[in-house]
Amino acid sequence: GGNIGTNAGGIKVIKYGMTRNWILGLTVVTGKGDILHLNKGMIKNATGYDLRHLFIGAEGTLGIVTEVQVKLERQPKNLTVMVLGVPKFTNIMQILSAFQSKMDLTAFEFFDDVAVDKLLATGHVQKPFETDAPFYALLEFEAPYEPIMDMAMQIFEDCMSEGWVLDGVMSQSIHQAQELWKLREYISETISVFTPYKNDISVLISRVPEFIADIDAIVSQNYPDFQVCWFGHIGDGNLHLNILKPENLSKDEFFEKCQVVNKYVFETVQKYNGSISAEHGVGMTKKPYLNYTRPDEEIDYLRAIKQVFDPNGIMNRGKIFD
């Protein structure tokens, strides 16, 4: 129910898409008490509005999911991981394009040197290679056959020749792949001690470099003592912005300043026609900022849909909008 309520995504969206891509049918109880059996597991069903998609991503505001029919997928074989050190953020986009043009990727993540420095300081993660880099790309792909590994190495060498990559490593075992994934998966826990101001945002993949440059400029101009840590699912345009609290600021002072940063960030999201919430939902925290992504006309339609399924407002009240 939680995955459906938020239309959950994650690190494999570039390959598998969002939760809604896998839901063949739903049984729900609406706020009116009606039991609806939506789509009933069918692949083809061209009989009007597909109501199941209203409940996916609705954050539980329309009804309660009681049963799900989910499409299954085979387990991937011989997942292989590459971590690449990258000199400029624009090079990450070029690397993504180079690999996607010739291979199917199961993940393509990025993180910056701030994240890596914090990770290495814990002693729980090993440096992937000796060369330092301002940005890092982590990509994953299935390699059940030797020619796929050869293709990946050829693309890597081409990227090196173009100057897009400073250094890199490719996993040779399941254990090494798991160790390389720690560079990405341990970031959130590691930076939590710095009381980060977090944002989960998205823009079109092609606009990511400009967007990040704009946000970095805004933060450095207005709050030069704030340290920014970036990571995210670059393969689908989902960025995790983290601003780390300076030691000389109290939590209250820091988060008061971050409320101003919020406005700058969401104005920039709006400028790029992006989303204030890529995968974590709106809930109560981002409710005041919904207009930065959704115009008034759309929000009016959302309220009208809510009224149809939950006229008494009993389902997860106070979330998304008032």
Language-model features, listed with the residues they occupy:
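Conserved, mostly hydrophobic/aromatic
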Residues: 60, 241, 310
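Activity-critical C-terminal alpha-helical subdomain
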Residues: 34, 287-322
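C-terminal substrate-recognition/cap domain of FAD-linked oxidoreductases
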Residues: 70, 74, 80-264, 268, ...
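Alpha-helix capping/hinge segments and adjacent helical runs
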Residues: 270-282, 311-315
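Short, hydrophobic/aliphatic alpha-helical segments
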Residues: 35-56, 220-221, 259-273, 303
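Small/polar glycine-rich anion-binding or flexible loop at a beta-alpha turn
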Residues: 114, 234-237, 276-288
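A short, flexible low-complexity segment enriched in Lys/Arg and Gly/Pro that occurs
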Residues: 24-44, 209-213, 248-260, 287-293
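FAD-binding subdomain of flavoenzyme oxidoreductases
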Residues: 1-109
